[in-house]
Amino acid sequence: MSHRLATALLFTLTNLVITMPLQATPLKDHLWKNRVIITFSASVKEPERLALQKQMEEKACAFTDRNLVHIDLLQGSEDFDEMSQQFAVSSSGFQLLLLGKDGGVKLRSSTASLEDIFSLIDTMPMRRSEMRGDQC
C-alpha cells in the first residue's frame, strides 16, 4: 500500500471518528472527555465549512491530540434547529462554536481557523496539563 493511500485511508478513518451526527453523540457524552466544535452551515458547499474540513484533514493529529470532536449540522435538519435554538445561533450562513470539556461555549465565530482554535485551547488550564504528554 502506498504511503499516499495509507495516509488518505488513515484520515478517512480518523474523520469518521471525529465528525459525527448529533444523534450518535449527545453532548453530555462529551463532558469532561472532549472539546466539541459544532458547525452550523446553510449548505454543504459553504466555503467556511469546506475550509474547516480541509484544515481538519491537514491537522488530524493536532485535532485528535486536543481531544476534539466535530459535530457538523446542516440547515434544515432537526439537529440544526434544536442546537441553533439551544445556543442562540443564527440560521443564516456559517457559525462555529467551540465547547470546552466543561460544556461551556469558549468561542463563537463566523470563520473557521483551526490555528485560532488550537491557540485558544492551548491557553486553557486543562489543556496545559494535557500538553505534558503530547503525541504530536
Model-derived features: positions:
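Non-catalytic interaction/Regulatory regions outside core domains
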Residues: S2-C136
